[in-house]
């Protein structure tokens, strides 16, 4: 699904299904440098069980246009505007990493929009390591590789996945490189 919000074309995954905001809505909130792709399997799981799932790419991420937002408050306001633009009265939020911080801010300022919230790998403070910032400035590919190592650990290099031909390391690297 594509829509225009704040003069930017926004992409939102609906799992290939028609979206009905009057049904039980699950809104997935991605983290920094991520996109709707990070929730593909979860999205499919809930969509096939009667939930109305939607996963927008924030401005400057994934398939969405526009400048990336720079504060958690601005991101929470953006999600509230997104929900209002689609006529979503209330949603269960599922946020990953920074997405969890966005959920907290959204629930704090727009409690009527939030039915429930689930948090995946979230903390109240998520500072970016100075070594990672320096590495990204010097060698973007090496910084992405380091993030994949930290995120998946040694087992991630085995490429063991329940879906043949799928690698979390490759998938994650391509996702991060696409948003760099």
Protein language model regions, located:
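Active-site loop/oxyanion-hole signature of alpha/beta-hydrolase fold enzymes
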Residues: 3-15, 40-48, 52-98
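Active-site acidic short loop of glycosyltransferases
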Residues: 22, 87-90, 111-112
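Short beta-strand element of the alpha/beta-hydrolase
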Residues: 22-31
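Active-site glycine-rich loops that stabilize anionic/oxyanionic intermediates
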Residues: 31-34, 97
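Alpha/beta-hydrolase active-site loop signature
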Residues: 33, 58-62, 124
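Flexible "cap/lid" loop of the alpha/beta hydrolase fold
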Residues: 101-146
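Conserved alpha/beta-hydrolase catalytic His-Asp/Glu region
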Residues: 127, 134-180
């Amino acid at each position: 699904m594509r829509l225009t919000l704040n003069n930017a074309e926004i992409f939102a995954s609906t799992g290939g299904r028609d979206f009905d905001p009057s049904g039980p809505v699950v809104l997935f909130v991605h983290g920094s440098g991520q996109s709707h792709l990070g929730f593909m399997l979860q999205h499919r799981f809930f969509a096939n069980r009667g939930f109305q799932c939607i996963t927008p790419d924030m401005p400057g991420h994934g398939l969405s246009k526009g400048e990336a937002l720079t504060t958690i408050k601005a991101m929470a306001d953006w999600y509230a505007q997104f929900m209002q633009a689609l006529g979503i009265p209330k949603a269960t939020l599922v946020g990953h990493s920074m997405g969890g911080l966005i959920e907290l801010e959204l629930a704090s300022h727009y409690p009527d929009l939030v039915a429930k919230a689930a948090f995946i790998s979230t903390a109240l403070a998520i500072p970016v390591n100075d070594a990672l910032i320096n590495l990204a400035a010097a060698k973007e590919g090496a910084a992405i590789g380091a993030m994949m190592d930290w995120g998946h650990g040694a087992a991630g290099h085995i490429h063991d996945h329940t879906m043949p031909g799928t690698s979390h390391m490759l998938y994650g690297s391509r996702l991060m490189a696409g948003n760099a």
